[in-house]
């Protein structure tokens, strides 16, 4: 007999994280989406994986993820409702062997579908797994101050990253590889998925100008914390600029010393010699 999936750690983690993202104002209405790669061992504790509820076609090639299981937020679903009604707002899916569809094993009980950003998520998982086999989470949200920065700050990866590093001491330690930035593109398309996944090969944070941010990590906490750290730096930057601008900041020499202390290396070329 399988256990009650409502007791699964992965369901509780997803419910807690979506609630926090909504509480922070980063996922208004049905904004934002999360995909969580699950191990088959943890899935079979709660579900009979041979019992397919329905099969949902995909418009891109997911063959590299064939057979893998994911917990995915639903299309058009509000993060504020996940904790109260997980089975309506979430789904456990398995990628078909040919990579052209996903099998729904649990959830979306009102007939819902996985997030419309599934192509961007799956492409990002493929990219991250190619460089980090332990990657499990891809998270998208509309972090307020990071979003605002894309209207007022130079949109080059080096300068955007340097500003974030200079705003909070922990930033270099948390994301020494910096942030990636793609052009503005229509969401929910393969094009934006391809652009995001290409950046994901070198970065875990990808800025979508005038839209939001993508983060990737080994766990829900790590991924949330990654975005949270960058967003805090963006908030500090916003406050600093409203107070008259930067008069002093963490220097490049101090950033180098920070990296040495915590055994991280800033992305090559991002610090001045």
UniProtKB/Swiss-Prot annotation:
Its main location: cytoplasm. Binds 1 zinc ion per subunit. It holds the Pfam family Aldolase_II. Zn(2+) binds at residues 140, 142, 211. Its cofactor is Zn(2+). One of its GO terms (molecular function) is metal ion binding. It is found in: Cytoplasm. Its EC number is 4.1.2.19. GO terms for biological process: pentose catabolic process; rhamnose catabolic process. The active site is at 117. Pathway: Carbohydrate degradation; L-rhamnose degradation; glycerone phosphate from L-rhamnose: step 3/3. Keywords: Cytoplasm, Lyase, Metal-binding, Rhamnose metabolism, Zinc. It catalyses: L-rhamnulose 1-phosphate = (S)-lactaldehyde + dihydroxyacetone phosphate. InterPro entries: Aldolase_class_II_sugar_metab, Aldolase_II/adducin_N, Aldolase_II/adducin_N_sf, Rhamnulose-1-P_Aldolase. One of its GO terms (cellular component) is cytosol. It is an enzyme of class 4 (lyase). Catalyzes the reversible cleavage of L-rhamnulose-1-phosphate to dihydroxyacetone phosphate (DHAP) and L-lactaldehyde. NCBIfam families: PRK03634.1, rhamnu_1P_ald. Belongs to the aldolase class II family. RhaD subfamily. This is Rhamnulose-1-phosphate aldolase. It comes from Listeria monocytogenes serotype 4a (strain HCC23). The lineage of its organism: Bacteria, Bacillati, Bacillota, Bacilli, Bacillales.
């Amino acid at each position: 007999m399988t256990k009650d999936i409502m007791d699964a750690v992965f369901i509780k983690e997803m419910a807690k994280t979506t609630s926090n993202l909504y509480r922070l104002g980063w996922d208004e209405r049905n904004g934002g989406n999360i995909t969580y790669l699950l191990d088959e061992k943890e899935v079979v504790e709660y579900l009979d994986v041979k019992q397919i509820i329905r099969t949902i076609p995909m418009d891109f090639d997911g063959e590299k993820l064939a057979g893998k299981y994911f917990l995915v937020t639903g299309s058009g679903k509000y993060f504020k409702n996940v904790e109260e009604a997980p089975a309506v707002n979430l789904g456990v899916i398995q990628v078909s062997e040919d990579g052209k569809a996903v099998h729904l094993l649990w959830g979306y009980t009102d007939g819902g579908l996985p997030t419309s950003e599934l192509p961007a998520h799956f492409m990002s998982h493929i990219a991250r797994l190619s460089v980090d086999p332990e990657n499990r989470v891809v998270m998208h949200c509309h972090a307020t101050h990071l979003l605002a920065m894309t209207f007022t700050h130079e949109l080059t990866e080096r300068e955007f990253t340097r500003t974030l590093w200079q705003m909070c001491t922990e930033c270099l330690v948390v994301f020494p590889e910096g942030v990636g930035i793609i052009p503005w593109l229509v969401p929910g398309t393969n094009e934006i998925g391809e652009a995001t996944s290409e950046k994901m090969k070198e970065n875990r944070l990808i800025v979508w100008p005038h839209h939001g941010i993508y983060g990737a990590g080994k766990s829900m906490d790590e991924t949330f914390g990654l975005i949270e750290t960058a967003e805090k730096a963006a908030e500090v930057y916003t406050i600093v600029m409203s107070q008259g601008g930067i008069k002093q900041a963490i220097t490049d020499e101090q950033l180098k010393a920070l990296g040495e202390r915590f055994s991280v290396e800033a992305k090559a070329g991002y610090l001045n010699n």
